[in-house]
């Protein structure tokens, strides 16, 4: 497990250092503020992709074990990690790589997860004012950019063979989260599989759609406007 933690920690270093110029948004471009960037597409039309070298190294910062992707505000980088069984939300200064703050989620039993996964896999969503984080072991937490907790919403831990991976999404005033249980897992309640939409300002549930026959899923929703 120690080797596994070190491997995930190192992968963060590479992402932050050598992928940094790709993720820096140009003025007026769509922000890289969610899983896979603008609307989850994985595409930045104005990005210039080159082969990184040691000369491109700006800074490096050791980080805890985890698999979430970094998301960017104007001057900060946000991601999650796990340290000493604590679920962490982490903010770094974009220019220097300095860790600005770490916030622990409320103490909870850590969900079961596959050795190649982690309980800190979902990627946060950040907008101009707030940061939204989902941990399968706990639920949703909203912070401001300075790390002040705005609200939290405990949710039942999804049951699956591999752990949780679905990331939160913001659309207008809604925070959307997919929560899927595996109907074929022992003690699993298939009726708990659902999509939630919460008021992003308060964490109050606005609507939910049940998926009673859906097995485990790890996808993150995207918005289709038509």
Question: What are these model-predicted stretches?
Answer:
Residues 2-15:
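Bacterial N-terminal signal peptides that target proteins for export
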Residues 26-226:
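Noncatalytic, solvent-exposed loop/strand surfaces
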Residues 8-10, 20, 28, 201:
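Intrinsically disordered, low-complexity segments enriched in Ser/Pro/Gly/Ala and basic residues
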Residues 13-23:
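Bacterial N-terminal signal peptides
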């Amino acid at each position: 497990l120690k080797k596994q933690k070190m491997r995930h920690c190192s992968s963060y270093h590479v992402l932050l250092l050598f992928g940094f110029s790709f993720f820096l948004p140009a003025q007026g471009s769509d922000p890289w503020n969610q899983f896979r960037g603008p609307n989850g597409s994985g595409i930045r039309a104005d990005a210039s992709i080159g082969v990184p070298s040691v000369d491109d190294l700006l800074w490096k910062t050791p980080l805890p074990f985890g698999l979430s992707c970094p998301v960017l505000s104007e001057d900060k980088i946000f991601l999650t990690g796990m340290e000493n069984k604590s679920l962490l939300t982490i903010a770094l200064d974009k220019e220097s790589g300095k860790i600005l703050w770490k916030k622990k989620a409320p103490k909870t039993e850590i969900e079961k997860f596959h050795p190649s996964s982690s309980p800190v896999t979902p990627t946060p969503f950040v907008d101009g004012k707030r940061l939204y984080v989902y941990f399968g072991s706990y639920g949703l937490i909203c912070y401001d950019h300075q790390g002040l907790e705005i609200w939290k919403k405990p949710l039942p831990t999804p049951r699956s063979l591999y752990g949780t991976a679905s990331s939160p999404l913001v659309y207008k005033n809604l925070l959307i989260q997919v929560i899927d249980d595996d109907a074929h897992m022992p003690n699993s309640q298939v009726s708990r599989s659902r999509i939630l939409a919460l008021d992003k300002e308060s964490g109050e549930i606005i609507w939910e759609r049940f998926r009673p026959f859906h097995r485990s899923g790890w996808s993150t929703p995207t918005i289709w406007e038509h």
